[in-house]
Amino acid sequence: MLRRKPSNASDKEPTQKKKLSLQRSSSFKDFAKSKPSSPVVSEKEFNLDDNIPEDDSGVLTPEDSGKSGKKLGKKWRAVISRTMNRKMGKMMVKALSEEMGDTLEEGSASPTSPDCSLDSPGPEKMALAFTEQEEREPPSLSRQTSTGSELCSPGPGSGSFLEESPAPQYTGPFCGRARVHTDFTPSPYDHDSLKLQKGDVIQIVEKPPVGTWLGLLNGKLGSFKFIYVDVLPEEAVGPVRPSRRQSKGKRPKPKTLHELLERIGLEEHTSTLLLNGYQTLEDFKELRETHLNELNIMDPQHRAKLLTAAELLLDYDTGSEEAEEGAESSQEPVAHTVSEPKVDIPRDSGCFEGSESGRDEAELAGTEEQLQGLSLSGAP
């Protein structure tokens, strides 16, 4: 008698139970169980059709269901992060390719940054490199995308903001100079103090009463303590400058009339003046406007030059004579005082009375004379 093959209804029920338990374990995790200390992501490629091991009875134990749920959760997270990283990488590559296309169209008007060389890969190669990098190292792609914009920035002034413009050097005013007598090296964290070496000369800018002065040394403006320096005495510049100007501006007095006329540029009148008696500078001093009329010199510029030269020559001689007289007069009283001998003048100290002794001597002399006169008159 033929037996009927049993139906597979009993076999289907365990599989349905397994699917339900799998879905529940993946959606609702076992929160009561502690997490592993060092979870390791499986390097196998994720496949939803993987067979899950089961025991002999065909029903999963709670421990197996928890482990499978954790594995699925980790795999889902890896898939999501991988897809997001790929999307972000593609967006960054697209943005970079657009920027590079714009710069290539504009031309090489502005120099590119030094980080980008001329042999840099095109946008397609960069896209391929990004995708390969994503497949090899999915976790570190977020860092690469965050720093991807810094790899090649075609901006014209990428490093210009790093270059600081040099500060203009201080040129004055100064209130004195000081020489360093003790070496001083400031702390490396103190950028305002000057490094002092013995013998350095500092141009003092400010001398506050606190004791920390401001000065210029070797082109650097900074502070220093006054105890390390000696203030140099200021040079008497005022009276010296006029004498230098006078010595530079003053020419020596001309010795001949021809030399004087050469200086004022009127050599053409040399023969006229010599023929009419103006042979020396002493004669030229007496030149007046009427004399020029007699000499037939009618050019107003020439007349003015000749008259001015005569007046200056006269003033020069009179000034030198007065200076010589003043020097002689200043030397005479000194010689007089030196040549005078010192005379000792007796002074009465007041201790002795000399008037009575003098009177007694005078009376004695008078009596002697009277006696002599009487004796002469009484003689026969």
UniProtKB/Swiss-Prot annotation:
Tissue and organ distribution: Preferentially expressed in lymphoid tissues. Expressed in bone marrow, thymus, spleen, lymph nodes and Peyer patches of gut. In the spleen and lymph nodes, expressed in both T- and B-cells. In the thymus, in the medulla and cortex.
Sorted UniProt keywords: Phosphoprotein, SH3 domain
Function: May function as a signaling adapter protein in lymphocytes.
Domain (SAM) ranges: 252-316
Protein's UniProt keywords contain Phosphoprotein: yes
Residues modified as Phosphoserine: S27, S34, S42, S97, S110, S113, S120, S320
Residue stretches of biased makeup (Polar residues): 141-150, 369-380
Segments of this protein annotated with the region Disordered: 1-76, 96-168, 318-380
Protein's UniProt keywords contain Glycoprotein: no
Family annotation (InterPro entries): SAM, SAM-SH3_domain_protein, SAM/pointed_sf, SASH3_SH3, SH3-like_dom_sf, SH3_domain, SPIDER
PTM annotation (Phosphothreonine): residues: T61, T103, T112, T318
GO CC, any one term: cytoplasm
The name this protein goes by in its record: SAM and SH3 domain-containing protein 3
Any Pfam family: SPIDER
Biased composition regions of type Low complexity, renumbered to the chain: 22-41
Biased composition (Acidic residues): 318-327
Gene Ontology BP terms: B cell homeostasis; B cell proliferation; CD4-positive, alpha-beta T cell differentiation; homeostasis of number of cells within a tissue; positive regulation of adaptive immune response; positive regulation of B cell proliferation; positive regulation of CD4-positive, alpha-beta T cell differentiation; positive regulation of immunoglobulin production
Gene encoding the protein: Sash3
PANTHER family in alphabetical order: SAM AND SH3 DOMAIN-CONTAINING PROTEIN 3, SAM-DOMAIN, SH3 AND NUCLEAR LOCALIZATION SIGNALS PROTEIN RELATED
Residue ranges of domain SH3 in the record: 173-234
Species annotation: Mus musculus
